[in-house]
């Protein structure tokens, strides 16, 4: 893939997700961000979006901090690209998590997350759509019972994001 900075971003994301596995398949977790990045690149051919797709779970699911990610991006890209990628990753990072909002049930957290994403940039929403598509394939194949719940949540999320 001829994307500016892609290999450095891929290494950073791979290192950040080291030891994490995909639910159901036990594959290295990094296979998911790579698949999302491939979908995004094929559809939009936007280097910054592709790199953000690779990093979309780094702040949410790893020990990497906002400051560490910003420093890495500023070493790798122009200031403009670094801030663009960082902004996309922040938009894609769940705020309404179980840890941050323990008094909210799953349905409430997902609804608030949908409302938050309604105000995300169009490009962040396009990455999120690719993320949902890739996760949906895996869940449909490996956990049809949970897929009913998951897909209903994602239909609701998409209605917030694109209406």
Where in this protein do the model-derived segments appear?
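Active-site helical microenvironments for divalent-metal-assisted chemistry
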Residues: 1-163
């Amino acid at each position: 893939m001829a994307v500016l900075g892609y290999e450095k971003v891929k290494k950073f994301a791979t290192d950040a997700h080291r030891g994490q596995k995909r639910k159901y398949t036990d594959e290295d977790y990094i296979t998911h961000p790579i698949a999302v990045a491939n979908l995004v690149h094929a559809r939009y051919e936007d280097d910054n979006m592709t790199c953000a797709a690779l990093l979309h779970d780094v702040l949410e699911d790893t020990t990497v901090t906002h400051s560490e990610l910003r420093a890495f991006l500023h070493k790798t890209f122009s200031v403009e690209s670094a801030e663009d990628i960082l902004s996309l990753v922040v938009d894609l990072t769940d705020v309404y998590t179980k840890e941050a909002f323990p008094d909210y049930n799953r349905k409430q957290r997902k609804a608030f997350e949908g409302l938050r994403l309604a105000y995300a940039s169009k490009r962040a929403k396009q990455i999120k759509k690719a993320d949902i598509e890739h996760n949906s394939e895996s869940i449909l194949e490996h956990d049809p019972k949970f897929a009913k719940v998951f897909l209903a949540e994602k239909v609701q999320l998409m209605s917030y994001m694109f209406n």
